Amino acid sequence: MINTLLSFWRAAPRPALLGLLLFFCAGFADGALVPFFPLWASSEAGIPVGAIGLLFGCYAGGELLAAPLIGGIADRVGRRPVLIASSLGVGAGFLALFFVHGVVVTAIVLLVTGMCESVLHPTILTVIADVTPPSAHPRWFSLARVSSSAGQILGPACGALLALVSLRSVFLAGGTMLVLGGIVTLFALSETSGIGRATGDDCPDDEEEGLSALLPAFRDGRLAKLLLWIVLFEVAGNWIEAVIPLYAHDAGTLTPSGVGALFAYAAALTVGLQMLVSRMVEARSAHWLTVGAGLATMLAFALLAASPAMPTLIGAVSLCSIAQMLVGPLVPTAVNALAPPARRASYMAASSMAVDLKDSLGPSIGTALYALAPRLPWIAGIPLVAIASLGLGAAIGRARRPSRPIEDDATPQLGSAVENYR
């Protein structure tokens, strides 16, 4: 077993391994930020609960503002400079949160940090796709989730220790990790944008630039429908991360350190089970996977609506982790398979925008519902997840069937790539 793993890592492309490292760093930073930011805002910063979601929205809003303009920039200037600049920029933004005071300044820092983050995750996925064959994309995207989740174990665990001193100090740890990742990328990553691209795949010189060129969802109807259902599914699922810290804290179930430990446990499940779950369900259809993820999320919401007790909190985050194991690798695999090689970063940026909407709308809507009634997010989330999971499965199924020729005809690639999940 150990020899097999060592052989795999030796044979793996270095850019893909660096991509996994950056996912780990980003996961660490997110894991340190997300569980503790609401607690820091409501206790140390004196921000009303109803406004916490708006600050989360500033971070995601920066991504949404920047993505239409620079989302596909890695297709034009290269992957390496984009990854270096974005990782250092996000890290510097997290470090700045340690020093800032006041709602307005915090909102500005989060907005700028979100702008830098708008190209980080999609470009990492693009680098991995550049240097690995399509048949291996599901495995590598699963490994990316494992790497991110490993960071999300250490992030909340480190944050739980730092929270004993000061909630603000978790930002310092998260920012430092991303800056280190950017420095490693600077010295170790080579350019990958020309790998695996045929001569005919280059973009025409006179092709339009701007919004329609960078956001192919406006031209590829299959991608647009797919991303719509992703947003609906992920918005409701995001309420677990955004609302549980407040829900558990107000009920007296968990301290800030306990919240960090809970999310570290959820990430540990992904690290330990993601590859196993992927192998177990590889013969299942995409529709089966999305419905299974929807049922797991609905059951988690039902548990939370019943009680904020510790067993239900553990059960809920466990079920949501399983749901993400089912659909997490499937979505980037389908999006990447739709993308022509010359537009790979742009398609990934469009997918990232869907996630950004989740990060913006999820906390905003979830905390607003929580301000009205503590159990309202869970009650409202059950029918929303049911509809979204059915729609997402149908959208992926339609994407696998040829409908009309699209740029560079990516349909055969989509069929073969998503077939790994059938």
Q: What does each model-identified segment do?
A:
Residues 1-13, 191-227, 415-421:
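Juxtamembrane intracellular "pre-TM" segments in multi-pass secondary transporters
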Residues 30, 112-124, 320-331:
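Core transmembrane helices of Major Facilitator Superfamily
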Residues 36-50, 242-258:
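Short amphipathic helix-loop junctions that connect adjacent transmembrane helices
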Residues 60-68, 152-153, 267-275, 359-360:
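Residue-level signature of mid-helix packing/kink "hotspots" within the transmembrane helices
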Residues 66-78, 273-286, 370:
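Helix-to-loop junctions at the C-terminal end of transmembrane segments
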Residues 81-95, 288-302:
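Structural signature of the two symmetry-related core transmembrane helices
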Residues 110-150:
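Cytoplasmic helix-loop-helix junction between adjacent transmembrane helices
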Residues 343-371:
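A late C-terminal transmembrane helix in Major Facilitator Superfamily
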